[in-house]
Amino acid sequence: PLYSYKVFERLSAGTGYTYFGDGNYDEVFYDEELDHDFASWVFGDSMEPTYLNGEVVLIKQTGFDYDGAVYAVDWDGQTYIKKVYREEDGLRLVSLNKRYGDKFAPYDEDPRIIGKIVGNFMPVEA
């Protein structure tokens, strides 16, 4: 059987610590049922080879778990999928693809951890 996933174009911080999709989502299918709170698209190659452009990432709304895990982060109007390290003045967002430099999200710009990436897949045709 194929399982349906709602994949949001963008995840945003709501009031407090709730998150919601922007209302625009695609329904995609995969042959496994995977536990998650949100699903979003991978755009670009900055997280290759683990997360490929066009794949779906599955997110659990865990808050910050540990340094070096891969999280969805809402910062400066964008959703980033990156390895995250907490530093004194902000969050360091690290790409897996070495061609990309780190990004730094200062705490005074209110970067928010949406949740931890708990899975990824390339959708299958229904």
Functional labels for PLM-detected ranges:
Residues P1-N53, R86, G90, G119-A126:
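Short, positionally conserved secondary-structure boundary motifs
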Residues D74-Y80, D108-R112:
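Short coil-to-beta-strand transition motifs
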Residues K83:
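Short, surface-exposed charged micro-motifs
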Residues R86-A126:
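Glycine- and charge-enriched low-complexity intrinsically disordered segments
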